[in-house]
Amino acid sequence: MSFDRSKTPTWRPGYRFQYEPAQKGHVLLYPEGMIKLNESAALIGGLIDGERDVAAIIAELDKQFPGVPELGDDIEQFMEVARAQHWITLD
């Protein structure tokens, strides 16, 4: 089954993506705690706005990082993990 890039990711209620100076990086805050995101996840997370679909997020990052092999696949993987961890919904 292939990933549907026309789906739009949205942070779940109670989850907030932000830069945290104390962590020197981006984090995902939620009622039970916090997850520190690596640089790649932070770049993707910064584009999750409930407006862009996955294809648009891939296109935007491809503009910023042209020629990166398997960029789309990596973003799909992030979306799958984020959905499995209940950080986002894909509608």
Curated annotation (Swiss-Prot):
It comes from the Bacteria. Coiled coil: none annotated. GO terms for biological process: pyrroloquinoline quinone biosynthetic process. The keyword Mitochondrion does not apply. The keyword Protein transport does not apply. One of its GO terms (molecular function) is quinone binding. Gene3D superfamilies: Coenzyme PQQ synthesis protein D (PqqD) (1.10.10.1150). Keywords: PQQ biosynthesis. Signal peptide: none annotated. Pathway: Cofactor biosynthesis; pyrroloquinoline quinone biosynthesis. Functions as a PqqA binding protein and presents PqqA to PqqE, in the pyrroloquinoline quinone (PQQ) biosynthetic pathway. Belongs to the PqqD family. Monomer. Interacts with PqqE. HAMAP family: PQQ_syn_PqqD. This is PqqA binding protein. It comes from Pseudomonas fluorescens (strain Pf0-1).
